From Swiss-Prot:
Belongs to the zinc-containing alcohol dehydrogenase family. Homodimer. Homotetramer. One of its GO terms (biological process) is alkaloid metabolic process. This is Alcohol dehydrogenase 2. An alcohol binds at residues 50, 70. GO terms for molecular function: alcohol dehydrogenase (NAD+) activity; S-(hydroxymethyl)glutathione dehydrogenase [NAD(P)+] activity; zinc ion binding. PROSITE patterns: ADH_ZINC. Keywords: Cytoplasm, Metal-binding, NAD, Oxidoreductase, Zinc. Binds 2 Zn(2+) ions per subunit. It catalyses: a primary alcohol + NAD(+) = an aldehyde + NADH + H(+); a secondary alcohol + NAD(+) = a ketone + NADH + H(+). NAD(+) binds at residues 50, 203-208, 227, 232, 273, 296-298, 323, 373. It is found in: Cytoplasm.
Length: 380
């Protein structure tokens, strides 16, 4: 790889030229990394709902043409000025949010919301000089959440790159750079269920199942899955879910159903849908005195959370979380080690594998609600 250091690399990338239209495989030029940047060779990437959401461009600022993608794994090809903790050949996970290690958030043991590198979905350029590292015929192609992994090579700020165990299989651990870590950490780091406790998981997609996996790892004895789609229930058993509730089967609010099932409420709940009614139910279904509800899903911008203040006065706790409270550079390597030590199973999240040339099929699968994670193999 040393022959490419300092040179523009021409490679394949799946470019989103406009909202909702199939990605187009293009030859793009990828400039060398600048100060505090690294250029990565992406080996595996997967598709997350966030990619689809911004590809559809419903309700946010459309930024096109753009290279999407943010769940991935690869190898460092070269590093820019000032980069000291990464070197060519390192195995890494690029992450959509960062850890500069200098701001108040990064120095805090409680926060992972880096002031410098926190996710920015509107920015399509690099922080260093306000320019894109991607171009076609000299015209810029914009970045996505600082990662743009639907390209054979990409340039990322060093603070958004987690160096991992080189023995870890990149085609498995690539899913840890977004959704799976988000759900897992929501349980392990924020809800913190104790051994033998009860946990309700709202939404049994990939993030919700990762939250269930976290509850299972923590030793919860009852994990109640709540979803409007009963076809998800059988699969969820693999992730430790012991009981299921479909709100459509009841005439009363689901929080009342869960309270009756659990003698007053669950010890913990994790909400992964982003629907405001589910968020309220997730809070109101936890037990008074000690119950903790954790919100993961992102609601509609005009949604309003309404609950009676007595629900707080009766000592229920409501928390929110971002990326499972994991600091990308400090913590994600440890999550990879959980997988390597067989504490965490990733294979059951991976339901499809496709070659890079068929990336649009991955979008079709997600739009149909088929499967959890589709791994896209970049090599021919």
């Amino acid at each position: 790889m040393s022959t490419t250091v300092g040179q523009v690399i021409r490679c394949k990338a799946a470019v989103a030229w406009e909202a909702g239209k199939p990605l187009v495989m293009e030859e793009v030029d990828v400039a060398p990394p600048q100060k505090m940047e690294v250029r990565l060779k992406i080996l595996y990437t997967s598709l997350c709902h966030t990619d689809v959401y911004f590809w559809e461009a419903k309700g946010q600022n459309p930024v096109f043409p753009r290279i999407l993608g943010h769940e991935a794994a690869g190898i460092v090809e070269s590093v820019g000025e000032g980069v000291t903790d990464l070197a060519p050949g390192d195995h890494v996970l690029p992450v959509f949010t960062g850890e500069c290690k200098d701001c108040a958030h990064c120095k805090s043991e409680e926060s992972n919301m880096c002031s410098l590198l926190r996710i920015n979905t509107d920015r399509g350029v690099m922080l260093n000089d306000g320019k894109s590292r991607f171009s076609i015929n000299g015209n810029p192609i914009y970045h996505f959440v600082g990662t743009s992994t639907f390209s054979e090579y990409t340039v990322v700020h060093v603070g958004c790159v987690a160096k991992i165990n080189p023995l870890a299989p990149l085609d498995k651990v690539c899913v840890l750079s977004c959704g799976i870590s988000t759900g897992l950490g929501a349980s392990l780091n924020v809800a913190k269920p104790t051994k033998g406790s009860s946990v309700a998981i709202f939404g049994l997609g990939a993030v919700g199942l990762a939250a269930a996996e976290g509850a299972r790892i923590a030793g919860a004895s009852r994990i109640i899955g709540v979803d409007l789609n009963a076809s998800r229930f059988e699969q969820a058993k693999k992730f430790g879910v012991t009981e299921f509730v479909n709100p459509k089967d009841y005439s009363k609010p689901v929080q009342e159903v869960i309270a009756e099932m659990t003698d007053g409420g669950v010890d913990r709940s994790v909400e992964c849908t982003g629907h405001i009614d589910a968020m309220i139910s997730a809070f109101e279904c936890v037990h008074d005195g000690w119950g903790v509800a954790v919100l993961v899903g992102v609601p509609h911008k005009e949604a309003v959370f309404k609950t009676h203040p007595l629900n707080f006065l009766n000592e229920r706790t409501l928390k929110g979380t971002f990326f499972g409270n994991y600091k990308p550079r400090s913590d994600i390597p440890c999550v990879v080690e959980k997988y390597m030590n067989k504490e965490l199973e990733l294979e059951k999240f991976i339901t499809h594998t496709l070659p890079f040339a068929e990336i649009n099929k991955a979008f079709d699968l997600m739009l149909k609600g088929e499967g959890l994670r589709c791994i896209i193999t970049m090599a021919d």
